């Protein structure tokens, strides 16, 4: 793999290579319960990297499908009452069957319904919680200065609260920002890379949660799975940005880079 020195100092390239190769070999079936804004993008991201996404959201099917899935993402971005019921069923079954799952608490704290739903989902023991700094602060019980889905808090500032949240919930916590942090409360991995243009394409952050769910399907260590997924994202983001003239070309190049990411 080509040199990405800051990234490699934080997370060994060997682990990324092993996990990416295993994902491409096994193509984990990933149950995606995400928001309507990013569904198509998320599916394309997972297909590009080598996973098998399935967008099953119906209350009548959610529990049945999660039993055969290798990983589950629950993203509350455009949550409805019916979605909340289906998500609770899926998370309950995932907890009962030891299916690893990711909670993405989009804009938690900004509105009451999604906040209450997220609190209930936390009780069902997500394997990984992925969010921006404001969302992680809110979940840790801190009054963050959130403005919807964008973060006004630095990811480094949120790290102590991510560690606290991990300790409270038992989940690995992944904080997205200029530098990504992945922590299990005791060990923390820093992921460097990516590019600011990634914030100009809707769904990029949400699809990282889905990618983590896919990596959980092939890697039993949730800290390593989250770090490998974040690193793949960062590498693809950095390379795509160098080839892009703006958000439109970046979106296309990002999918291509995920698909073509070389193992050298």
Curated annotation (Swiss-Prot):
Q: Which reaction does it catalyse?
A: 5-(2-hydroxyethyl)-4-methylthiazole + ATP = 4-methyl-5-(2-phosphooxyethyl)-thiazole + ADP + H(+)
Q: Is the keyword Ribonucleoprotein in the record? A: no
Q: Which UniProt keywords apply?
A: ATP-binding, Kinase, Magnesium, Metal-binding, Nucleotide-binding, Thiamine biosynthesis, Transferase
Q: Which domain of life is it from?
A: Bacteria
Q: What is its EC number?
A: 2.7.1.50
Specify the enzyme's EC class, one word.
Answer: transferase
Q: In its keyword annotation, does this UniProt entry include rRNA processing?
A: no
Q: Which residues bind substrate?
A: 55, 203
Query: What Gene Ontology terms for biological process does this UniProt record contain?
Result: thiamine biosynthetic process; thiamine diphosphate biosynthetic process
Q: Which cofactor does it need?
A: Mg(2+)
Which GO molecular function annotation, any one, does this entry have?
hydroxyethylthiazole kinase activity
Alphabetized Pfam families for the sequence? HK
* Positions that bind ATP: 130, 176
InterPro entries in the record: Hyethyz_kinase, Ribokinase-like
Pathway annotation: Cofactor biosynthesis; thiamine diphosphate biosynthesis; 4-methyl-5-(2-phosphoethyl)-thiazole from 5-(2-hydroxyethyl)-4-methylthiazole: step 1/1
- Role, per record: Catalyzes the phosphorylation of the hydroxyl group of 4-methyl-5-beta-hydroxyethylthiazole (THZ).
The similarity comment for this entry is: Belongs to the Thz kinase family.
Q: What is this protein called?
A: Hydroxyethylthiazole kinase
Q: Which organism is it from?
A: Leptospira borgpetersenii serovar Hardjo-bovis (strain JB197)
- Gene name of the record: thiM
